[in-house]
């Protein structure tokens, strides 16, 4: 193995080493601090290595893994926001094994974003899923165990569908690497449909979304952030790679993505309208955002890769900020609990409101530019029905986001926020800064995305 290949695999190695050390420390230490430091070090080193590799020519690694801009962006993204999730996972008081599982989720996401082969695709997805099952259950409350059990059962079904789909594709094409997936027979079409169903579950697309609101409500907020940010981004990048490298049957693949995306936008936004619990509202909201991303993926418009990566970059700090603020208010704060929060905790109130503003896609916050990318892709592809659904979804989203956006600044009462840690404060400031930076200077993120995509 050459030095270039070792350098290309070094971020994955950092994540794996951090996870293993955290696992070894968990049973022999009295607190989770040592394991948390080990996992955080692995995540930080992986993110730093990917930043240092910016502009370095890709190294040929083999059929299983691809060292290109998509993989590098996805690895840095997973490491950075995995580290963010680890910061406020402590709020829930979860087990000492949790930091190792966070690093494993990031490792699975990094593997998935660079997957060029069915084996790597399966490995990445299952590493994410199995780690999330344990993380969802760790508080050992009724809601957490229910969320974990639902995710376990449905994840098993999705994995079965995915494996059967890959087997049928292999029977038709005789290949497991993505470039070899070329065919037009019925087995290929059925295999593609099953593969899409398996990916749709991991992506929280309707009708495979049922686990998402329960996970956001019952699981630790850090675990919800991993499922809603890191896992979602990895699956989106894997679909981008399938779009570009595999020749999946059309219009089955794009029409399936478009249909699932449209259904997710409508289901997620409509069900979020009636929610009074902040985490559950965010759970339905993330289903809608999965739908928006699926619409971009299905459009096939010029600049699809740029639009998806930009949307993911905007979406991550917004959802992370809202989930962190929610965790600091208690296990499942309601709308009424937010009343008057700005007088007690101005940082939490501001970060929560700005995060919701970005998720709604309103001006000033970065989400506004992300919505412009969405509408541009749908107009360029002349997907007028999808455009109408996206606009209706955005209007519905504005209504329920604005309810939670205004609550901290009006009224009295509410709950007494839990004591906060300095790292929580730093995370909120970091996410707030990213949201405002990408809102006022979106070229910063656009430049980073285009630099990543230039590495082929």
Swiss-Prot record:
It catalyses: a quinone + NADH + 5 H(+)(in) = a quinol + NAD(+) + 4 H(+)(out). Pfam families: Proton_antipo_M. One of its GO terms (molecular function) is NADH:ubiquinone reductase (non-electrogenic) activity. The keyword Transmembrane helix applies. InterPro entries: NADH-Q_OxRdtase_suN/2, ND/Mrp_TM. One of its GO terms (cellular component) is plasma membrane. The keyword ATP-binding does not apply. It is an enzyme of class 7 (translocase). It is found in: Cell inner membrane. PANTHER family: NADH DEHYDROGENASE (PTHR22773). NDH-1 shuttles electrons from NADH, via FMN and iron-sulfur (Fe-S) centers, to quinones in the respiratory chain. The immediate electron acceptor for the enzyme in this species is believed to be ubiquinone. Couples the redox reaction to proton translocation (for every two electrons transferred, four hydrogen ions are translocated across the cytoplasmic membrane), and thus conserves the redox energy in a proton gradient. Belongs to the complex I subunit 2 family. This is NADH-quinone oxidoreductase subunit N.
């Amino acid at each position: 193995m050459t030095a270039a290949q070792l350098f290309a695999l070094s971020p994955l190695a950092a994540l794996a080493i951090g996870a293993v050390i955290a696992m070894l420390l968990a049973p022999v230490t009295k607190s989770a601090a040592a394991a948390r430091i080990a996992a955080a070090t692995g995540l930080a080193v992986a993110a730093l290595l990917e930043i240092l590799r910016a502009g370095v020519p890709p190294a040929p690694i083999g059929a299983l893994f691809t060292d290109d801009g998509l993989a590098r962006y996805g690895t840095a993204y997973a490491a950075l926001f995995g580290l963010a999730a680890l910061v406020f996972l402590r709020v829930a008081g979860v087990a000492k094994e949790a930091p190792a599982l966070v690093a494993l989720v990031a490792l699975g996401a990094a593997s998935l974003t660079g997957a060029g082969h069915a084996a790597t695709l399966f490995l990445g997805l299952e590493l994410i899923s199995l780690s999330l099952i344990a993380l969802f259950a760790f508080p050992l409350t009724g809601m957490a165990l229910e969320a974990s059990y639902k995710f376990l059962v449905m994840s098993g079904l999705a994995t079965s569908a995915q494996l059967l789909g890959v087997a049928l594709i292999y029977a038709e094409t005789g290949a497991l690497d993505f470039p070899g997936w070329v065919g037009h027979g019925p087995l290929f079409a059925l295999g593609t449909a099953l593969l899409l169903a398996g990916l749709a579950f991991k992506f929280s697309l309707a009708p495979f979304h049922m686990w998402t609101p329960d996970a956001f409500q019952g699981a630790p907020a850090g675990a919800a952030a991993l499922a809603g940010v890191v896992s979602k981004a990895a699956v989106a990048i894997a679909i981008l790679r399938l779009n570009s490298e595999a020749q999946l049957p059309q219009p089955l693949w794009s029409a399936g993505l478009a249909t699932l995306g449209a259904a997710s936008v409508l289901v997620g936004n409509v069900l979020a309208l009636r929610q009074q619990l902040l985490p559950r509202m965010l759970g339905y909201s993330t289903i809608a955002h999965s739908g928006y991303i699926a619409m971009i993926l299905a459009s096939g418009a010029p600049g699809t890769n740029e639009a998806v990566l930009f949307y993911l970059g905007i979406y991550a700090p917004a959802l992370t900020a809202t989930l962190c603020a929610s965790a600091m208010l208690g296990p499942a704060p309601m709308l009424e609990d937010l009343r008057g929060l700005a007088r007690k905790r101005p940082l939490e109130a501001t970060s929560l409101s700005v995060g919701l503003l970005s998720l709604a896609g309103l001006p000033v916050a970065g989400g506004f530019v992300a919505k412009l990318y969405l509408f541009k892709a749908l107009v360029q592809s002349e997907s007028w029905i999808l455009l109408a659904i996206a606009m209706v979804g955005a209007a519905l989203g504005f209504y329920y986001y604005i309810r939670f956006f205004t609550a901290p600044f009006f009224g009295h009462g509410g709950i007494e926020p839990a004591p906060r840690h300095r790292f929580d404060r730093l995370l909120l400031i970091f996410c707030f800064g990213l949201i405002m930076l990408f809102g006022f200077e979106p070229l910063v993120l656009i430049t980073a995305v285009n630099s990543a995509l230039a590495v082929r």
